Regions:
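Extended catalytic cores of very large enzyme megasubunits
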Residues: 1-130
Length: 130
């Protein structure tokens, strides 16, 4: 799908940072999930990546909303949800399972890092306040 994404942005998990939308990141995530499921030949993998990426872009296009500047903005979660939906819609259930599992592991890791940072900050504050 050839599309101009120059006014598409992704709001990062900090809910402040806007970065340019990059459909190649979607393709890479799909590719990683496919590779984790099985070792298929490169041409089949690339065809599947393109098909799924195109489906994700269609789903995103159906959910476009504009910010005050007239730019299209999606959250990371919205994009990931569309990837999951595209994988299931296209019948790639094992790939969807791998993608969802990886996504959940990353979420748990982020939560652990956040908890660890909070513990560290509390420790430092207690150390200097005593």
């Amino acid at each position: 799908m050839s599309k101009d994404f120059s006014n598409w942005y992704v709001i990062k998990r900090d809910n402040e940072t806007l970065v340019p939308f990059d459909d190649k990141k979607i393709t890479k995530a799909i590719s990683n999930a496919i590779k984790a499921v099985n070792n298929i030949d490169k041409s089949t993998n690339e065809l599947t990546e393109k098909t799924v990426t195109d489906e994700v872009l269609k789903l995103l296009n159906d959910h476009i909303r504009y910010n005050v500047s007239g730019d299209v903005v999606f959250s990371v979660e919205e994009i990931q949800n569309c990837v999951e939906k595209a994988l299931v819609t296209l019948g790639l259930y094992e790939v969807a399972k791998e993608y969802i599992t990886y996504r959940e592991k990353r979420n748990q890791l982020r939560m652990m890092k956040s908890s660890l940072m909070q513990t560290y900050q509390d420790f430092i504050m207690n150390l200097f306040l005593k």
